[in-house]
C-alpha cells in the first residue's frame, strides 16, 4: 500500500526494495519490510499551521481511489462493539458503549461519502520535520474504505487536544485545511460531532478489549477511560456550539 501512496504522490513512509526489487524479505524466517528513515520528531502540541497543512493532506488522501483489496470496515468499528459481551457483558463499560452506539448510529447514513481512509491519525503517527514546517502522516496499518467523516472525527480526537481535553480551536484549523481541498457536505457537517464521538469510543473499545481480554495488562486496564471520558465530553457539547466553534455552521453552507 505504501507503494500505492508513493505512486500517487502522497508523502509518507517509503519502502526500501531488496536487490531483486522485492518489498518484503525475511530475517530469521520472519517476514520484514524496511522503510526509509523519516527525520524529525513527534509532537503532541501541533501548531495552527501544521494542523491546517495536515487537514489538507487528509483531504488529499481522501481523493485517492481506494484499491479493491481494502477492508470496508475499521478493525475497531461499531460493527465489533458487541465483542465486549464475550468477556464483560455485565460491565458498566459495555452498557455505556451500547448507549454511545445508539447515539452514533442516529447520524450514520448510506448517503455519507466513503473514501480511502487512514482511520488512526494520532500525533504518534505523524512526524514533524526538524524545522517544524512540515508534517508527514505514517503508519497505514489500519487503512480501509469507510466513511471519510470517521477519519476526520478520529483525527480531531487524535491531534486536537490540549492538556487532555478536546480543543475545538485546534480542530477548526484542521477543518480549515481539509476544506481547502474538499468541501464538507451538509450531512457530513451534521454528522461530525457524532463521528468525533465515534472516534473516541472506538479507541476506548480497542483499549478496553486489548488490555482487559486480549493482552491482559493490569497496569493498563483503565487506559480506556481517557477516550471514554473524551467521548462523553464531545457528546456533552451542544450541537450548535460544536459547529460554531469549528466554523462549520450548517446555516452558512
Where in this protein do the model-derived segments appear?
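All-alpha amphipathic helical-bundle segments outside canonical DNA-binding/catalytic cores
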Residues: 184-196
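ATP/Mg2+ or Mg2+-diphosphate-binding catalytic cores
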Residues: 203-253
Amino acid at each position: 500500500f505504501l507503494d500505492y501512496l508513493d505512486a500517487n504522490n502522497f508523502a509518507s513512509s517509503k519502502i526500501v526494495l531488496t536487490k531483486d526489487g522485492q518489498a518484503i524479505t525475511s530475517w530469521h524466517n520472519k517476514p520484514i519490510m524496511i522503510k526509509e528513515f523519516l527525520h524529525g520528531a513527534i509532537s503532541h502540541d501541533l501548531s495552527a499551521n501544521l494542523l491546517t497543512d495536515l487537514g489538507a493532506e487528509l483531504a488529499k488522501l481522501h481523493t485517492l481511489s481506494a484499491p479493491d483489496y481494502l477492508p470496508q470496515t475499521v478493525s475497531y468499528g461499531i460493527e465489533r462493539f458487541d465483542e465486549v459481551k464475550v468477556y464483560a457483558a455485565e460491565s458498566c463499560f459495555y452498557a455505556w458503549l451500547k448507549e454511545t452506539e445508539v447515539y452514533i448510529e442516529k447520524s450514520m447514513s448510506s448517503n455519507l461519502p466513503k473514501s480511502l481512509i487512514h482511520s488512526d491519525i494520532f500525533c504518534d503517527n505523524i512526524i514533524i520535520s526538524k524545522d517544524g514546517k512540515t508534517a508527514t502522516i505514517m503508519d497505514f496499518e489500519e487503512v480501509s474504505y469507510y466513511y471519510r467523516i470517521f477519519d476526520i472525527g478520529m483525527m480531531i480526537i487524535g491531534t486536537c487536544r490540549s492538556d487532555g481535553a478536546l480543543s475545538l480551536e485546534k480542530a477548526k484549523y484542521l477543518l480549515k485545511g481539509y476544506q481547502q481541498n474538499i468541501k464538507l457536505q451538509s450531512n457530513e457537517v451534521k454528522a461530525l460531532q457524532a463521528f468525533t464521538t465515534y472516534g473516541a469510543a472506538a479507541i476506548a473499545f480497542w483499549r478496553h478489549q486489548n488490555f482487559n481480554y486480549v493482552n491482559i495488562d493490569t497496569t493498563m486496564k483503565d487506559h480506556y477511560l481517557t477516550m471514554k471520558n473524551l467521548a462523553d465530553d464531545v457528546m456533552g457539547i451542544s450541537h450548535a456550539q460544536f459547529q460554531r466553534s469549528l466554523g462549520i455552521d450548517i446555516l452558512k453552507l
